[in-house]
């Protein structure tokens, strides 16, 4: 079984990083896609822990901006060739996982935007380049693709609806994914169930975080969920998203990360 988890870590501070590590190291997923990483001490501490545990860590540099990292407990081959054409390559990470058959995982952290023209154009450029990247993938690789992360967009049929908030090019992301043959794992597994992965100050829910799979993987979907614990425990402000694919993974390849030691108390 190949299991994948994606989570926006909210540019974790060093103070939050240990608690976040305890949660992540307790998870069974072999691939962790972390979005909104940063160049700060918190992200560095978190990723260094997994490196010391023998995990493979892919974290493209993106000075002064927020990015994406992939942590793998099973062997992977980094694929910077896939992300090179993106308008902001450091906002994505890609690797091919050594499963049977091989699976390519692409994690993205789509830029957020308000109505400031520069931010709108930055987001539009990224989504346009993502569409081009998907279109340029070989057909077989796209069929064995897992795309996931924080898309910073909701679907047209999202509940609650937020009329006037999203621009047509933002909604069009999901048309792009459908045209690429990618299936929303959650919608496939639990049709008609609305989940939320981020909540605004007024308590309004938004589904920003997703996992999509290619046509050859759709029938291998075995399970998945939205996990609210990271948000409820204030480890970050997002829920995690998981999926399980019924694919062969050599058990000898799995590398368990050591537990994070609880801080000592005075009494």
What does each model-found stretch correspond to?
Residues 227-267:
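Surface polyanion/phosphate-binding segment centered on an Asp-His-Pro turn
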